[in-house]
């Protein structure tokens, strides 16, 4: 059910496209709140880009590892604005990508504080998972 709830946040038409994907996506609360704060059009574009990556498209303009950290970013350009959704892999739970939070990017480089925030949320995620 988690997958369907996640897809509904982006755009209902994505539910119609349930082909085999290479990974599942889980949104942490901050990522969900970020997406809900965006317009339907922006959410739809982000969702379509994520779906392309889930189906195996390898394009650093859509999904890119950030330096030497364990953090990746889903990248979307819409109406001259750059949207970023930070994420990491949890390979213990099949193949799962966990999105931590998102930003509307305003600078050339991804802010270090946003990468640090994603890294902290990643650590918390695994601590909580291991304590369950």
Model segments located where?
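Basic, Lys/Arg-enriched alpha-helical interface segments
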Residues: 1-82, 91-97, 104-132
């Amino acid at each position: 059910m988690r997958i369907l709830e996640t897809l509904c946040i982006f755009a209902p038409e994505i539910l119609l496209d349930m082909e085999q994907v290479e990974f599942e996506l889980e949104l942490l609360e901050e990522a969900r709140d970020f997406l809900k704060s965006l317009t339907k059009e922006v959410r739809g574009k982000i969702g379509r880009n994520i779906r392309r990556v889930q189906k195996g498209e390898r394009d650093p303009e859509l999904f890119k590892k950030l330096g030497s950290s364990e953090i990746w970013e889903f990248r979307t350009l819409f109406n001259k604005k750059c949207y970023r959704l930070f994420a990491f892999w949890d390979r213990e739970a099949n193949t799962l990508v966990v999105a931590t939070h998102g930003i509307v990017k305003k600078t050339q480089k991804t802010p270090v504080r946003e990468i640090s925030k994603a890294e902290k949320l990643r650590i918390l995620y695994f601590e909580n998972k291991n304590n369950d």
